[in-house]
């Protein structure tokens, strides 16, 4: 859910730019159906924003896990967590751009004064 009233311990994602550098965007073909997709790799998301990664168990032959049936555990990604990271990366980038623009304007003024 996105409603602030339903959340506790709200914190801005720190070091978002450094975190996002641990991830890439990919295109890929899903093994189970051969269809093309785009997205991220859960293991990379686990490094960057572990709060966005969960897991699921897939049972053989569509089983339900009853009677001690073993399945394989796979990671899943909640893309709302990745979106939150991307929003914070955009904000950090905007802050850096603004600082560089201000520095550039100051340097131009100093250069004009020298000329």
Residue ranges and their predicted role:
Residues 45:
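Active-site-adjacent helical/loop segments in soluble small-molecule enzymes
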Residues 8-22:
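Periplasmic N-terminal gating module of Gram-negative TonB-dependent outer-membrane receptors
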Residues 39-40, 76:
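Short aromatic/basic micro-patch
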Residues 2-9, 26-38:
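Active-site-adjacent substrate-recognition loops and nearby beta-strands
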Residues 16-19, 41, 86:
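Stable alpha-helical elements in mature extracytoplasmic
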């Amino acid at each position: 859910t996105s409603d602030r009233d339903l959340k506790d311990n709200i914190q801005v994602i720190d070091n978002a730019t450094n975190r996002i550098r641990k991830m890439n965007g990919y295109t890929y073909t899903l093994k189970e159906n051969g269809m093309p997709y785009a997205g991220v790799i859960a293991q990379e998301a686990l490094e960057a924003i572990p709060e966005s990664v969960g897991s699921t168990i897939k049972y053989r032959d569509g089983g339900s896990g009853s009677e001690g049936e073993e399945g394989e555990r796979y990671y899943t990604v909640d893309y709302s967590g990745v979106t939150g990271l991307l929003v914070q990366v955009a904000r950090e980038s905007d802050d850096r751009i603004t600082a560089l623009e201000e520095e550039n304007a100051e340097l131009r003024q100093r250069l004009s004064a020298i000329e």
